[in-house]
């Protein structure tokens, strides 16, 4: 029998009606202004620096106010964005980039090559693809105000792919003085050269974030395509409204009080599709992978046997069923990469084929020397995935005989706490859950969660020399078949040292009012340029 969120989340989320029809209270309509689009996103925006965090909501914020040198089009091919023209030397060691005319920051200063070099270097310190690229970079000289170079020590075919990555953190261009901030410290300023301006005066953190059209932004001449082409803003204002209660958000959407709802309750999608005033679609065709990250710095998950225990303890059907109900929008996946992608394989997946085995998990926890100390599970009560995932993680761990401290908080607080390296009893953590887009999860270079470079890496901080060797080998492989073979090696090793466990793969729907058009689908980011709204 499939577990539904109505059972497991009783008291954890607003009560929803039966799946026959959504329980949407008719609210007194207060439609938003014709050229203002009000959106409810998957989480509240708490961190404003899209390099410091990989949180998607912060990447959305970044895409509003910053721009990138290159952008992926709708076919996931890199295209110049802030760059006017570029070239590569015959020996494939020197890349030269020239910026477009008319690029300005919102403080009025021109965007210069020096700004871009500093931005690339700060981004590379936090990005998996950036770190891989910079290991092969000899120098990044500024030629003039509009021109700079990247000089390599050896040919590396992923330079342009890296600069155009859609995976968080994206390579956003900021002012040189902001880019010189320690990458492990947050930039507090929000001065960018993107299509929108962040309106701090009217923003109310925890309630609403306000973005106004940037009148000085010069879009490219090409049609918009994904993160590339002309980012033409057809609205005066976009607001991110923080409405944590799903039923309230649904009521507001149907009443026209909000215009766009990124992640409505997924078990009610079939009913929402029947509403003639709404458009309901999957915007990210690559889907998402849900995962539970394990902290390798502290017991019990500093022991590989305890991490392997989680493979046997996890039951993907529980989490996916709680979110999607009877919907067919998800699948169980045992691959170290997103299922259905070129890197998918079944190497070292006996645990997945076997299914949940609590007895086996208990045995592995005992072998790991579990000492009875509480396992701190971070649960974001306002996040569609991190809420049920936290509840189930606590349930599974208790079934295996472990003591659990279920730490409830909002998503913004979780994003801050997951960066804490102190022991769990001192404000740290043992597990948290999140989502990664399929296109990112299948790329061991772009996804920083595939890195195993210890405390320099992503939250959880796994360390595994073989994984790092295989990632480099994958990046340098000249053919797809060679990369597939290396991916099998990587998966065999990955499910031995276990940086995280997979909670399922899914395709989530978004909903918006019929009078909103021009919505562009893209992994990792929801583009708000090109959107129009009629009365």
Name these PLM-found stretches.
Residues 297, 301-341, 388-389, 494-502:
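Periplasmic-binding protein-like
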Residues 512-535:
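Long beta-strand-rich cores associated with HINT superfamily self-processing modules
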Residues 196, 330-367, 383-388:
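Structural transition elements
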Residues 98, 132-180, 184-202:
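Surface-exposed binding/hinge segments that line
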């Amino acid at each position: 029998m499939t577990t539904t969120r109505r059972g497991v989340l009783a008291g954890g989320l607003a009560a929803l009606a039966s799946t026959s029809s959504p329980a949407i209270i008719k609210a007194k309509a207060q439609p938003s202004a014709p050229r203002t689009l009000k959106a409810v996103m998957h989480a509240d925006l708490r961190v404003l620096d899209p390099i410091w965090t990989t949180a998607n909501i912060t990447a959305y914020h970044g895409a509003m106010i910053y721009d990138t040198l290159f952008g992926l089009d709708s076919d996931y091919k890199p295209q110049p964005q802030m760059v006017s023209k570029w070239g590569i030397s015959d020996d494939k060691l020197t890349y030269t980039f020239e910026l477009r005319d008319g690029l300005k920051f919102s403080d009025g200063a021109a965007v210069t090559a020096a700004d871009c070099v500093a931005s690339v270097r700060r981004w590379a310190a936090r990005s998996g693809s950036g770190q891989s690229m910079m290991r092969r970079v000899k120098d990044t000289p500024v030629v003039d105000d509009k021109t700079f170079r990247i000089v390599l020590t050896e040919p590396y075919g992923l330079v342009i792919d890296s600069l155009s990555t859609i995976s968080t953190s994206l390579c956003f261009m900021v002012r040189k003085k902001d880019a010189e901030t320690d990458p492990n410290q947050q930039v507090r300023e929000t001065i960018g050269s993107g299509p929108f301006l962040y309106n701090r005066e009217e923003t109310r953190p925890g309630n609403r974030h306000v973005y106004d059209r940037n009148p000085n932004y010069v879009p490219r001449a090409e049609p918009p395509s994904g993160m590339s082409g002309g980012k033409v803003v057809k609205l005066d204002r976009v607001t991110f409204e923080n409405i944590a209660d799903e039923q309230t958000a649904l009521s507001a959407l149907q009443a026209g009080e909000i215009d766009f709802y990124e992640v409505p309750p997924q078990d009610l999608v079939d009913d929402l599709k029947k509403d003639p005033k709404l458009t309901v679609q999957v915007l990210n065709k690559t889907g998402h992978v849900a995962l539970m990250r394990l902290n390798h710095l502290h017991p019990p998950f500093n022991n590989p046997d305890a991490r392997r225990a989680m493979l046997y303890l996890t039951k993907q059907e529980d989490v996916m069923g709680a979110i999607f109900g009877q919907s067919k929008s998800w699948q169980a996946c045992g691959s170290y990469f997103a299922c259905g992608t070129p890197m998918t394989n079944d190497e070292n997946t006996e645990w997945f084929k076997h299914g949940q085995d609590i007895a086996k998990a208990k045995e592995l926890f005992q072998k790991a020397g579990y000492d009875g100390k509480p396992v701190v599970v971070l649960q974001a009560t306002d996040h569609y995935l991190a809420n049920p995932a936290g509840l189930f993680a606590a349930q599974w761990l208790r079934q295996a005989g472990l003591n659990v401290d279920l730490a409830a908080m909002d998503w913004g607080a979780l994003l801050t706490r997951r960066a804490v390296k102190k022991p769990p009893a001192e404000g740290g953590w043992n597990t948290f859950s999140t989502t990664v887009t399929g296109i990112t999860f299948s790329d061991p270079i772009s996804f920083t969660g595939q890195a195993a470079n210890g405390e320099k890496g992503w939250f959880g901080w796994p360390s595994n020399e073989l994984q790092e060797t295989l990632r480099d080998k994958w990046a340098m492989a000249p053919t797809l078949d060679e990369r597939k073979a290396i991916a099998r090696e990587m998966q065999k090793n990955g499910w031995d040292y276990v940086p995280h466990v997979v909670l399922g793969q899914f395709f989530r729907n978004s909903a918006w009012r019929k009078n909103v058009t021009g919505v562009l689908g893209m992994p990792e980011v929801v583009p708000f340029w090109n959107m129009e709204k009629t009365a």
